[in-house]
Structure formats: structure tokens, C-alpha cells
Swiss-Prot record:
Keywords: Aminoacyl-tRNA synthetase, ATP-binding, Coiled coil, Cytoplasm, Ligase, Nucleotide-binding, Protein biosynthesis
Pfam families to which the protein is assigned, alphabetical: Anticodon_1, tRNA-synt_1, Val_tRNA-synt_C
Family named by the database record: Belongs to the class-I aminoacyl-tRNA synthetase family. ValS type 1 subfamily.
Recorded GO MF terms: aminoacyl-tRNA deacylase activity; ATP binding; valine-tRNA ligase activity
The organism of origin for this protein: Zymomonas mobilis subsp. mobilis (strain ATCC 31821 / ZM4 / CP4)
Name the record gives this protein: Valine--tRNA ligase
Length: 884
């Protein structure tokens, strides 16, 4: 097949992906081979591919494709999460378009409509994953509401309940009054909003004075149960134990001592509303207030209700919280107890899906005793059974698990795994895997009603590493698929998903779910700012694929993925790596046009020419480095090593060095030509294999374009470099040649020697080895460095530039070519100008106020400028020193 003149990614991507999938090449079918297992973090079934997914899935696909090439039985489990809230909202919005509401139908009817929606529209993100090139085993695709997966979820709930690790309790939750459900911390978005501090004066019961408290939510004062002061605050020590008469309600509440009160903040006194604030809830418990006795003054829609104390004025009952806020402030003011109102920018919690302010709300929910499950998970990391990469996240992991709270797992939704609990008419809870078992436990004839709530989606997805592999019906450990080999995840779900998988895996499988946990950062805009739709700076990965191809996007994400850092995604980088793909395309096309064909040998061809022995050695060197980079999970080094080898070593040097051989018409060179064509074909094969995990489409296309194959590249064999003969002498000799030519080119460029002008090179008194190389490589040096002639005698007097390579000094005579004095003056002025810029930048970065107040991306930009100035000065000084 003749390689097209122009590289067109769109023309090859869908063709090859369809071929791979139809041929079953993503499915593990290598009996006896070492298994390699990876599970994809399941995206929401409602989702579409965003740039974070593209990063996450590219990093995983690189590992899976590499494992396949290494001969492993690679399985990449793919699937989607049922995404309770998100999916229910999508279906409800669709119903609204046709004038229907969820509440107009029974639960079963609505759930059936969700399944209908999934069948019609739920495959968007999996289709988009295919466009990225993700080599998942689609035959093994899972969904967290599948029958088998649901069986695992129910079994885990019942088992944990029977062990006393799941229980029902009254605690504060993040309550979304619009959706009418508890939500997780990850679904809460903290926004900066313009708010107020209302300062109220609370009178003492005995009339002897008052205490000033400040609040951002004055409506909650209806449920205040105490005022807290710091036990070390001398201003209030005498008041501890006395009572406050709470305005409006006229209820007495105590003044208590608690370290939560900060003497340096405001008045140092804090109103305590345990039923509506997470910190206050803990203060209330420390003060001996039982959750069952904590006052609740809001219903599930955030409307005011009567409290257990029955002291809320009737005019407030039924009002929305914000309407009540206004009236309460007016009442406090009318009582003469409003001290002041202070404008303040505050952090307020909002539901990330509903967009409404979240209420800490006291309610009965189902909880997991996470503290007990966390202990083995902590030990797994401490003992080294799980390695977190980058290691810096280990401290965060410890901090979260050492301070873990009970995990609220119930949600007030219709879509999801319905909690397997049935209640008798007298309120007894019966926990069973199905209704038949529950009825047996309760006794025949006993009326049962099922708990209407569903489980948190994080509860089901925590079982992903083993439930996707058939548990509990099949033992993934017996299949060699558990533990999985590694997990790749965004750092933002370290606690919500990763840690919980570790807890559940250790508890039910008695082993860690993975020995390595790799956490990548965020993909940010080019200026370092966080991407958001409101800023209009989001990047559509599919748009980049349309414009530059999937391979270019994948290589960009790989090259920019540096452990512990966020990615600043600049479209120019994607364009640059598209150019890299084009360079590879043109290089292979050049080889084909010069009669290079397939070389299927796993061993390098016999080679006598130094250039051929050198490229074979460099191929072994890079293959070894790539394996190490993958072992260390250094994606940036992986991409950079390949880029340097393909662009520099292979395209810029090897192809240039062998061009005279390929284009020679002399019969006596036929032996050299055949050897070089054999080596060229073999090296191209190794390049395509090594590059395939990052750039699967272009490599598969070129693999087949070079000639007939008995297998696809995706299942080829990784270079077996350990058995190759490597000529270190050839490596050293060509390295010397490259450094000499590079130095001559740099000198010509820095001193403005006309590119087309050929100049002589003098090498008087150089070491014997250098002299030998100079003679051997004479044709290369003359052609590639634009050298007219090479002389062993000293250079003539006059303007000249000297070049040092190891112990050898070479001279380029430049008399009549450049004005030496003018060139010195130009270089000195350039050095002064750059040093001035460098000094100004150093001064700016040395100013603590600038570093503290400037945007992070501005500070980073200045640091980068400083590095560039330093490099430029070094380069200019080197050019000045070369002038003789």
C-alpha cells in the first residue's frame, strides 16, 4: 500500500478502531499469559467526554496497550455509573418537555422510563471513548445497575448490616432542598457570594447584660440551642453556665464553654445551632445534646416548620428560608437587638446540579461505620501494599482516613439501588437480599413496606474492582484479575472513590484492590486558570480530535502529565504534536519511496556500518528507557523519550546520515544499501511498536502500509532489547559526530554566517581519536555542517570562531565573512539587554507582595521568563567566547 502524500487522521481513525473492535483485539484471549487488569473509573451514563476524561483514559490506554505488546493477557474493564441524581434529573427534564412529572407516576413506571432513556441516549460517552482510541474490552462492558452488579451491591449492604457496620442514625447531611435528597460532599460546590454578617445582641436571662453573636444565616436562630465561648476567654468565664433568653422565641439557652469559639473572631461568642450547622452539631454533641433532641426548624423544601419546643411564631411557619431571614432580621431590629450588619464575601455551599444553596439538615439516614473499615485501608498504604503516586498524596490520604466520619449512604431518589430494608407496621427493620427472604424473617402474613431510599452511587462504585469481574458468583482472584494491576484516578476522588474501593476490597476480597494508585492533576486552561463554562475557557476534546487527530491529543496529554502537577493545556501543543505525527508519516513515506519494506525480524539485522550499528543501539536504549518510565509511571518522560528518539535521532540524524546510501546508483554500494534498507525497515517497526501505546492510529496505519503482515500492530511484540547486541563504540562515535555538527551549526547561526555559504574547518593539534573520526566522517561533516574543506593545519590569521568538542578544538576562519568587532559589539549589547530584563524579573520575583498577590499563573510566567533569560545569556556568552 502506497502511503498518501498527506497525513489525514480522520481518514484512518474510525477505520482502524472498527477493525480492532470487530476482530476482538481488545478482548483478552491469551491463555497462559500473565494477566494485566485495569478498570476504568466509570463515567456517568449521562456524561459526555470532557478533557479530564480524555486525560484519565489516555493514561490508562497507554498502560493497557503496552501490556498487550509485552505479551500479557490485558483486560481493560469498561462501564458506566448509573449516576442517580444526574440521571434522574435528565429524565425528569425530558418528561417536563412533554408536560409530565415524576410524581405523576408510580416508581416502577418512572424507573422503566429511565431504562428506556438509557437504551436510547445512554451510550454517548462510550461512543466518544472509542474516538479517543480507548482499547477497552467492550464485550465486558458493565453498568452499575446491571443485574449481576446489583446483586453484588445488595450482598455487600446485607453483609455489612449483619456485621454491625451499617446502621440507621440521625445526623446532619448536605441537603438539597430542590432535589429533595441528601448529597455527597463532592456534589457540593462552595461559591464566593456577596453576603452579610448580622450581629445580634442576645440578652442574658437575669437582665445583667448581653452577648453579641454574628451569623451569616439569621433564620437559623430559631433553632439555636446554646451560645459557645472559649473556656480560656477571660471576658466570658463568669458567664459560663448562665442562660440567654433567645429573642423572638423567648426560649432559654445556656452559655457553654467550647474550643470551637475563637476569641480573636468577632465578639468571641458563637451561636450554636446543632440541627443546621456541621460544626455546631459536633459542639452540641460535646455539650451532651443528643441528635434526637436537636431542634430542626426547616422541612425538606427549606421552609420554616414548628420546632419541638413549639416556640416559632405562627407567621413564620411555611415561609421559605430566605423570606423568613428577612422577617427575622426585621423583628430583631424592632426589638433593638440588631447591633450591625456587615457586608462580607462569604463561602456558601450550593448543589452542583441543582444550583441552589445547600442546607445542613438533621435527618434519619443509613450510614456505614467508615472508621472501622478505614483502619485496614490505612495500614495497606502504611505497610507499602499500596503505593500512592505521587507520594505527596499519601499524607492527604492518611489525614482523611484518620479523621473519617460515618458515611451517609442513603439518597432520597427513585433511580438507583433501592435499599434492601423492609419495615413492619410497628417500625421494625428487616434487612434481606430480597423481599421473599425479608418476608420469611418477618413471618408470613406480616405486612412489609420497603424503604423508599436508594444507595449513594459511591457505595456501588466502591465495588467496581471486583464486582465488574463477576463477584460474588465468580472469584476474580482465582482468575488472576484481582487485585487489579493499577488504578488511575483524578486526585479529586481520592477519598470519595479510591479510598472506599480500598476499604471494600480489603473487607470483602481480603486483599487490596490494586498495588499502585496513580493520581493525576486537573487539566487547566493555557493560562493556568481552572476551566469552567462560565469563563468560556473549556476545551472540547472531540473538537481537538476533529482538528488535529486523536493521536496528537493523546501525545499532548501524555507529554504534559507530570506527577503532582496540573496540566496547562495550550492548543498550540496539540498542533505541535500533530506536526510530530506528520514528521513520522513523512519519514516512513520517505523510507517507502526508497524501497524500504517490512522487516519482521525481532532481532536487529546484521550491521557493519557505524550509522546502522548506532541506530540499533539507540533503539535498544530508548526501548529500555520506555519500560522504566512506564514502571515508574512517568508519562512525561515516556513521551519525551519517544519524541527525542523519533524526531532527533531517527528523522534528523539517521535519515540524513543514510541518504547518500539510499540515493547512490553505484553498484559497489549495493551491500551497504541492502544492509541499510534492512536496518531502516527494522528500526521503523520498532518505532511503530514503541509509539503505538500513545499514538495507536497512525502507527497501525503505517505498520500495514509498509507491507503485508500476518498480525496487527496492536498485538505485535514489544522490542526484546535484552537480547540485542549493542555497539557502544558506534554510539560514542556518532554522538561525537552529532555534537560536532551541532556545534558548527550553532556557531554559524549565532554569528550570522550566511546559511548557504560553505566555510573551511581547521583542526590543528587535536587528539588522535578525534582526528580519526574527522577523517571517517568527512563526507557527513561537509554535507551536514556546510563545510567547504577540512584542514589539519592551523587556521590562517584573522577573524575566526573556535569550537570545542571534548578535548578537541576546531576553528572556523571567518575573515571577510563577518565584521568581528561589530559582531562582538552586537553580542555584548544583546547580553546587556537580556541581563537588564533578567534583573527586573528577579526583582519582581524577590518582592514578597508580588508573589503573594499576583495570580499564580502570572508568577509562574515570570519564573519561566527568568529561566529563559538565564539560558539566553549563557548562549550569547558562549557565542562571544567563540570569537578569536
Amino acid at each position: 500500500m502506497t502511503i498518501d502524500k498527506t497525513f489525514d487522521p480522520a481518514a484512518i481513525e474510525s477505520r482502524w478502531y472498527t477493525h480492532w473492535e470487530e476482530e476482538g483485539l481488545f478482548h483478552p484471549e491469551r491463555p497462559g499469559a500473565d494477566p494485566f487488569t485495569l478498570v476504568i473509573p466509570p463515567p456517568n451514563v449521562t456524561g459526555s467526554l470532557h478533557i479530564g476524561h480524555a486525560l484519565d483514559d489516555t493514561l490508562q490506554d497507554i498502560l493497557v496497550r503496552h501490556a498487550r505488546l509485552k505479551g500479557k493477557d490485558a483486560l481493560w474493564v469498561v462501564g458506566t455509573d448509573h449516576a442517580g441524581i444526574a440521571t434522574q434529573m435528565v429524565v425528569e427534564r425530558n418528561l417536563a418537555k412533554i408536560g409530565q412529572k415524576r410524581t405523576d407516576m408510580d416508581r416502577e413506571t418512572f424507573v422503566n422510563k429511565v431504562w428506556e432513556w438509557k437504551a436510547e441516549s445512554g451510550g454517548t460517552i462510550t461512543r466518544q471513548l472509542r474516538r479517543l482510541g480507548a482499547s477497552c474490552d467492550w464485550a465486558h462492558e458493565r453498568f452499575t445497575m446491571d443485574e449481576g452488579f446489583s446483586k453484588a451491591v445488595i450482598k455487600v449492604f446485607v453483609s455489612l448490616y449483619n456485621e454491625g457496620l451499617i446502621y440507621r442514625d440521625k445526623r446532619l447531611v448536605n441537603w438539597d432542598p430542590h432535589l429533595g435528597t441528601a448529597i455527597s460532599d463532592l456534589e457540593v460546590e462552595n461559591r464566593e457570594v456577596q453576603g452579610h454578617f448580622w450581629h445580634f445582641r442576645y440578652p442574658l436571662e437575669d437582665g445583667s447584660g448581653e452577648i453579641i453573636v454574628a451569623t451569616t444565616r439569621p433564620e437559623t436562630m430559631l433553632a439555636d440551642m446554646a451560645v459557645a465561648v472559649n473556656p480560656e476567654d477571660d471576658r466570658y468565664k463568669a458567664l459560663i453556665g448562665k442562660n440567654i433568653r433567645l429573642p423572638i422565641t423567648n426560649r432559654l439557652i445556656p452559655i457553654i464553654a467550647d474550643i470551637h469559639a475563637d476569641p480573636e473572631l468577632g465578639s468571641g461568642a458563637v451561636k450554636i445551632t446543632p440541627g443546621h450547622d456541621f460544626n455546631d452539631f459536633e459542639v452540641g454533641k460535646r455539650a451532651g445534646i443528643k441528635p434526637a433532641d436537636m431542634l430542626n426548624m426547616l422541612d425538606s423544601h427549606a421552609r420554616v416548620i414548628q420546632t419541638a419546643e413549639n416556640d416559632v411564631p405562627e407567621e413564620l411557619i411555611g415561609l421559605d428560608r430566605f423570606e423568613a431571614r428577612q422577617i427575622i432580621v426585621e423583628k430583631i431590629d424592632a426589638l433593638g437587638l440588631l447591633d450591625k450588619i456587615e457586608d462580607r464575601v462569604i463561602q456558601a455551599p450550593y448543589g452542583d446540579r441543582s444550583g441552589v444553596p445547600i442546607e445542613p439538615w438533621l435527618t434519619d439516614q443509613w450510614y456505614v461505620d467508615a472508621e472501622k473499615l478505614a483502619q485496614p485501608a490505612l495500614e495497606a498504604v502504611r505497610s507499602g501494599k499500596i503505593k500512592i503516586i505521587p507520594e505527596s498524596w499519601t499524607k492527604t490520604y492518611y489525614n482523611w482516613l484518620e479523621n473519617i466520619q460515618p458515611w451517609c449512604i442513603s439518597r432520597q431518589l427513585w433511580w438507583g439501588h433501592q435499599i434492601p430494608v423492609w419495615y413492619t407496621d410497628d417500625g421494625q427493620a428487616i434487612v434481606a437480599e430480597n423481599e421473599e427472604s425479608a418476608q420469611e424473617k418477618a413471618g408470613q402474613g406480616v405486612n412489609l413496606r420497603r424503604d423508599p431510599d436508594v444507595l449513594d452511587t459511591w457505595f456501588s462504585s466502591a465495588l467496581w474492582p471486583f464486582a465488574t469481574l463477576g463477584w460474588p458468583d465468580t472469584d476474580p482472584k482465582a482468575l488472576g484479575r484481582y487485585p487489579n494491576d493499577v488504578l488511575i484516578s483524578g486526585f479529586d476522588i481520592l477519598f470519595f472513590w479510591d479510598a472506599r474501593m480500598i476499604m471494600q476490597g480489603l473487607h470483602f476480597m481480603k486483599d487490596v484492590p490494586f498495588p499502585k494508585l496513580y493520581l493525576h492533576g486537573l487539566v487547566r486552561a493555557a493560562d493556568g486558570s481552572k476551566m469552567s463554562k462560565s469563563k468560556g475557557n473549556t476545551v472540547d476534546p472531540l473538537g481537538l480530535i476533529d482538528k488535529y487527530g486523536a493521536d496528537a491529543l493523546r501525545f499532548t496529554l501524555c507529554a504534559m502529565e507530570s506527577q503532582g502537577r496540573d496540566i496547562k493545556l495550550d492548543e498550540k501543543r496539540v498542533e505541535g504534536y500533530r506536526n510530530f505525527a506528520t514528521k513520522l508519516w513523512n519519514a516512513v513515506r520517505f523510507a517507502q519511496n526508497n524501497n524500504c519494506a517490512v522487516n519482521t525480524s525481532k532481532q536487529p539485522p546484521e550491521a557493519t556500518l557505524t550509522t546502522n550499528r548506532w541506530i540499533i543501539a539507540e533503539t535498544a536504549k530508548v526501548a529500555r528507557a520506555l519500560d522504566q518510565h512506564i514502571e515508574d509511571m512517568r508519562y512525561d518522560e515516556l513521551a519525551n523519550s519517544l519524541y527525542h528518539f523519533v524526531w532527533n535521532d531517527f528523522c534528523d540524524w539517521y535519515l540524513e546520515l543514510i541518504k547518500p546510501i539510499l540515493t547512490s546508483t553505484e553498484d559497489q554500494n549495493q551491500g551497504e544499501l541492502q544492509e541499510t534498507l534492512a536496518v531502516l525497515g527494522w528500526v521503523i517497526d520498532q518505532i511503530l511498536i514503541m509509539l503505538h501505546p500513545i499514538m495507536p492510529f497512525i502507527t497501525e496505519e503505517l505498520w500495514h502500509a509498509l507491507g503485508d503482515r500476518d498480525h496487527d500492530l496492536i498485538v505485535a511484540a514489544w522490542p526484546d532489547y535484552k537480547n540485542w547486541s549493542v555497539d557502544e563504540t558506534a554510539q560514542n562515535d556518532i554522538d561525537w559526530l552529532i555534537r560536532l555538527i551541532t556545534a558548527i551549526r550553532a556557531t554559524r547561526s549565532e554569528l550570522n554566517v550566511p546559511p548557504a555559504l560553505k566555510v573551511p574547518l581547521h583542526s590543528h593539534g587535536i587528539p588522535e581519536k578525534a582526528a580519526h573520526n574527522l577523517e571517517r566522517f568527512d563526507p557527513f561533516i561537509k554535507r551536514l555542517a556546510r563545510i567547504e574543506s577540512i584542514h589539519k593545519e592551523a587556521a590562517p590569521k584573522g577573524a575566526a570562531a573556535q569550537i570545542v568538542v571534548d578535548e578537541a578544538t576546531f576553528v572556523l576562519p571567518l575573515e571577510g565573512v563577518i565584521d568581528l568587532d561589530a559582531e562582538r559589539g552586537r553580542l555584548k549589547k544583546a547580553i546587556e539587554a537580556v541581563e537588564k530584563e533578567k534583573t527586573a524579573t528577579e526583582k519582581r520575583l524577590g518582592n514578597p507582595n508580588f508573589v503573594a498577590r499576583a495570580k499564580a499563573e502570572v508568577v509562574a510566567e515570570n519564573r519561566e521568563r527568568l529561566n529563559n533569560f538565564t539560558g539566553e545569556i549563557t548562549k550569547l556568552k558562549a557565542a562571544l567566547e567563540r570569537l578569536m
